[in-house]
Amino acid sequence: MSSKHSDPLERFYKQFQAFVQNNPNVISAARAAAQIPESAKAVVVLSPYSLQHVFPREWVTKSYRKTIVERPERLLASSMGISAAITMYPSLFTLKSSHQRKGSLMAPHVLKVHGSSWPAELIELCQMADAKLLKGEIEVPDTWNSGDIYLSSKTIKALQGTIGAIETGVDSIFKGPSAEHISNRAFVAIRPPGHHCHYGTPSGFCLLNNAHVAIEYAYDTYNVTHVVVLDFDLHHGDGTQDICWKRAGFKPEEEPEDSSYDDFGKKFAEFPKVGYFSMHDINSFPTESGFATKENIKNASTCIMNSHDLNIWNIHLSKWTTEEEFNVLYRTKYRTLFAKADEFFRSAKLEMNQQGRPFKGLVVISAGFDASEFEQTSMQRHSVNVPTSFYTTFTKDALKLAQMHCHGKVLSLMEGGYSDKAICSGVFAHLIGLQNQDWVKEWGSEQVVKEIVRGCKPAWKPYKTKRAKDVIRIWAEEVIRLGRAMIPEFDDIIFKDAVNSAPSNSLLKATVEPASTSTIAQRIIRSHRSNASPEKELHENKPRSTEKQEQREIRSDTKVKQLSSNNRAAETQIPFLQQEFSSEDEDEEYVYDEELNKTFNRTVEDITIDDISRHLETLEIEKKGDEDSDHELKEKNWKNSHQRRLQGNGMYKIPSNTKPHRIRQPQNANTPTYDDSDISMISHVSRKHTTRSGGRW
């Protein structure tokens, strides 16, 4: 790890401060962080060590290298999605780095999942890999798919970092002096993914099963007894499901002979008890042609509840043509996962109560984004996917499940997602849902996503020309600067070649631009537009030659604000006067969409006005009698102290073809909102608590 950065988030803090200072419409929202308790914020855990797992075969062709989709750049793409969410809700997230925490592949919570043989073998293979690579030999065993999995000595450090990040995520939602000081939700951005890894067999980019390692750590450290795993990756999590069979007492094929099993390969089920609930493409890996054995297809289609200590439910993705058609699929088909997960938790509570034992639940999300509408077609060869809004809707349903059974505790672990667009947009929408906010259709538009993913280029640099009204491009560059500042190791691993080949005055490095010299522009909110001068309006309609002349006059007569080492622009009510620069890095296909920019801008302004009040509408669950009693749901709005009683008893119901009654539709929320999913789920919130989210913010 780089010793140049004592605090790995220092660069991000400074960039965030510049963002806030240059965006007066978010200053109040950022300051409001002091009034929001930690329990109401979502923790985002970054894993710098995960970057160390790099494709090591230097002798392969460039075309072959391009086929390696599980790469460090995936974390950069996720950082873009994280920063996009932070710019929208700057007071609702706490950012953590696990740079000082490396777990052990031989830790008890790893060995309980994978046994002692596989972690030891994996370490040995990584240690031997470098010598093989120097000889030009494939470093993985012949029985492995060398196109999917690669190893090097640095892979050990990456896996240690992944384990450490997982532990940090679990600690974040369970450890603290009081409930008010503990967050209820955490998203952990890690790689490589884990849900294809079996008890003793790696597969599909996965070397350890991250979800089960997290579950075992939560059980060992915080006495979690029952866990629901919700998996929305495009691919079936065959490894996660297989380990659920092991937890139920069934002998894994890879496990050595053990006398504790009976003649049928079964023994008593282990704690913690885990239910696995997945939606995936039945025609993609591991059930794609070439992998689609009869056994694999059966596994990816298993549906069994409360039998033989197993709770597994699989749903296959269907094609759709319009988002409304998808919403019908979601309500009538995919939400069945939550009904089954609810059934698992309720049965578990009843059983534990009958045994006189304490119940403690947790919801784990295997958050893969390769089912996104923005994923590359080579990954989605069978034309099934989900709209970006799905990631918000599904996550909000997961929050409700957790609120009903687990005191709101949700741990989300990044799984798949291999194109920059899929990861950026998916993480963005997922984090909006993780804070129970509404997804806005414009945020997931092609143009918005395209602008954000520009920041995933190692040699990214800001546009040299901007229109003052091009809100999307201005906002996207704010997002990019924040995202590229999140992990200092991006410089050494991803940006290195681009920086080394850049001229000395280049803007390629993800360096911080302080408020006094920042290119971060103010969002153009209505109050700014109303204060814009008539001269500015005339200016926008004048020829460029006239614009250039007037810009020179403005520079000579007014105070100027430095935008970069070479470029200056007048400091006006609305920044970024149109300027003449070379267009070597401009998007020639770009067409300014005035209506989209106006609509996008309105959504941004509306958030800054009411994000806190909307967020602090809390759902309190009051228990009557024992844990199995029905729950009374109350939603409190702190803004106006209005209290309304929700319909029903809060239980999930098996979906039907009948469209539910639609309740209040929030302004600018284009995703349909239904009475059985649109409720706030933030628990243990106190207005008296004033802990800041990372006091530096």
Swiss-Prot record:
One GO MF term: histone deacetylase activity, hydrolytic mechanism
EC number assigned by the record: 3.5.1.98
Bias kind Polar residues: ranges: 561-573, 665-674
Gene3D superfamilies: Histone deacetylase domain
Keyword terms: Chromatin regulator, Hydrolase, Nucleus, Phosphoprotein, Repressor, Transcription, Transcription regulation
Miscellaneous comment text of the record: Present with 4420 molecules/cell in log phase SD medium.
UniProt protein name: Histone deacetylase HOS3
Species per Swiss-Prot/TrEMBL record: Saccharomyces cerevisiae (strain ATCC 204508 / S288c)
Native organism taxonomy: Eukaryota, Fungi, Dikarya, Ascomycota, Saccharomycotina
Gene symbol of the encoding locus: HOS3
